[in-house]
Amino acid sequence: MNDAAERKLVLSNLWVAFLAFVVACFLGEYQVLERSGFIPALESPTVYFASVSTHGVLMAFVLTTFFIMGFGYYIATTSLKVPVWNIKLAWCGFWVSLLGTVMAAVPLLTGNASVLYTFYLPIQAHVSFYIGATLLVVGSWVWCLIMLVMFGQWKQANPGQPVPLAMFATTANALLWLWTSVGVALEVLFQAIPLALGWIDTVDPGLARTLFAWTLHPIVYFWLIPAYTAFYVFVPKQAGGFLFSDEIARAAFIVLAVFGLPIGFHHLYMDPEQASGWKLLHGVGTFVVSLPTLVTGFTVIASLEIAGRLRGGKGLFGWIGSLPWSNSMVLSVILALLMLILGGFGGVVNASYAMNAMIHNTAWVPGHFHLIFAGTTVIMYFAIAYYIWPLLVKKPLFSNSMALIQLWTWFIGMSILTTPWHVLGLLGQPRRISSVVYNTLLTLAWKPYELAMIFGGLILLGSACLFIYNLAKTQLNPATEEFTQQIEYAEPIHPVKALPEYLNGFKLWNRVIAVLMAISFGVPILQFFFMETFGSPAWGY
C-alpha cells in the first residue's frame, strides 16, 4: 500500500477503534472497583450501568467494527495489489459509522441508554442510541460491499487463479457480517425505534431476543476472523517458516462463515419462547462450529513447528524454544492460543444444555467472553497493529521491548481478571449486578476473588495505556531515515497452483447459508406471527 489516501483511511479507522478501546478499559476498571464494594463512595447503580453499557458498546461494536474495516481495507489493497474500490464510498461508510458512534455515545454517557450492549427489550434506551447503532452498522455494510466488489473484480481479472488467502478470509468475514447483522437490524428497525418513539405501546420480548440471538453468537466470529487471518497469513512468516496448509485454512473460514451463522439459541436455553427441539438443533450446530477452531489450532501449531525446526529446534518439543519469542506477532499467537484453549473449554460448558443451567446468568459468563474476546481476539488486534503500524506511517515501531511487555502484561492481567470471574460464577455470583447489598457466608467468600479482579484490571489498564502510547509515539516521532519494510504474507509449504471453486469463492456457500438460516430461524421467528401472544403482537402493531 503506497497511496497516502488509502493509508489515511486505514489509520483513521484504526485510531477510532483504539481510542474507543482505551476509554472502555478505564470504564472496565471502574466497574470491578464499584462491584467489589471495597470503596463505598463509588457505589451508584445509575453510574455503574451507564458505565457497563458504554464499556460493552465500545468494545463489542466500536472497537471491532472500526478495526475490522481498517484491517480489511489494508488486507484488500496489499494482498490483491489494487487500490480501494471507490475510496469516496469507503470514507462515506467511515463517517456514517462515526456519526452513529457519537449519536449512541451521548445517551450512553448521560445514563439514557443503560441497557447493556445487548439492549434486550422491553428495557428502553433513548431513540438516538438505536439510531446511532443503526448508522454504525450501515457504515459497516458499506465496507462489506467494497470487500465483495474487490473480491469479485479480482477473480474476474484473474480467472482460475487462487484468491489470496488473506482476502478470502476477509471476504468470508464480510459475508458473515452481512448475514448476521440482519437479525439485530430487524429488531432495532421494527421494534426498538418504534417503541422508543412512542409509535407502539408494546413489543414481544421473545421475538426481540430471538432476533438478537440471530446476531449474538455469529458476531463473535466477526470479531475473531481477523485474529484467525493473522494466525494464517502473518504468523508463519514472522516465525520464519511456512503455512502448513492453505486449503485447510480456507476450509476453516468456510465452516466458520457457514455454520457460525445458523446458531445462537444456546443464549436462549432458559427462555420459554423457543421449543427444546430448536434449542437442541442450535446446540448441535454450536459444537460443529468448534471444529474450525480445533483445525486452526492444529494448523497454526504445525506452522510454528515447521518454523521452529527450520530455526534449528530438535527433539519433540525443542522447536518451541527456537521460535522468535521476541517477535510480537509470534508471542501474541502463543498467548492467544493459550487463552483460546481455556476460553474454548468454557464455551463448551455454555453450549451444553445441562451444564449451561449451572452457570446461566452468573459471573462465569462475562468471565468466559472476556477471555475469548478481550483475551484471544484483542491480543491479536495488538499484534496486527504492531506489525502494520510501521508500514502505514513509514516509520519503525517506537519500542519493540515495550510491545513485548505490553503483550505479556495483557496476558497476565487477563488471566488474573478472568480466573476469579469464572470461580465467582461457580460460587453463584449473579452477573449484571452493581453491588451486593447483603452479607452472608457465601457473599463474604466472594471478596478475595473480587480483590484479585481489581488487581488484574489495573494490570490490563496499564497494558492498554502502553499500547496506545507505543502507537502514538511511532506515528508522531520524526522519520530519521527512509523506511523500506514491506508487508510479507506467509507462503504455504506446498504452493497452491489451482483450487476448486468451492475453496475459491462463496456462491455455493451463500446458497447453503440461506438454506441453513431458513431451517434454523424460519419457524422460530414466524411462530410469533401465528400464535396467540395475549395482547403483544410480534412487531407491536
Language model features with spans:
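Hydrophobic cores of alpha-helical transmembrane segments in multi-pass integral membrane proteins
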Residues: 10-41, 46-82, 87-114, 128-151, ...
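Fe-S ferredoxin-like electron-transfer domains
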Residues: 122-124, 128
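Generic start-of-chain signal for non-secretory N-termini
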Residues: 1-12
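Intrinsically disordered, low-complexity regulatory regions of eukaryotic signaling and scaffold proteins
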Residues: 65, 275-278
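Membrane-interface helix termini and inter-helical loops of multi-pass transporters
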Residues: 116-119, 271-275, 355-360
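Membrane-interfacial, low-structure loops and terminal tails that flank and connect transmembrane helices
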Residues: 1, 156-161, 307-325, 478-506
